[in-house]
Amino acid sequence: MAKQIPVYLFVGQLESGKTKFIQETMEDPNFDSGDKTLLLVCEEGELEYDPSRFAFGGVHVAQIEDKSELTPENLTALEKKSGCGRVIIEYNGMWLVQELYDAMPDNWLVPVKSSMNFS
């Protein structure tokens, strides 16, 4: 069985602050798991990532410019190319999330956290 890879999925409207939040997270040394990271960028906003400011190395940034690129074969190839142990996805808010779930390799896991019960 292939190694299970956690996926951090960020979904929201265009210009809702996803890129800024992810950039700030990547600048935090506490987010360094020791694993290589595949950062999938599925939309172009006003801000761009600055990998020189990331707190750790081993980050492979890949652009997904069209949802037709969301295939199990393409995502598996990106996983192998990057050698990643985790995936961060800035998802396009205009695309259906189900299309991403249908395309994700079986070993990619998206843990779901709800803030409904947080105080």
Which residues are covered by each model-predicted region?
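Nucleotide-state-sensitive switch-loop elements of NTP-binding domains
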Residues: 2-12, 16, 20-118
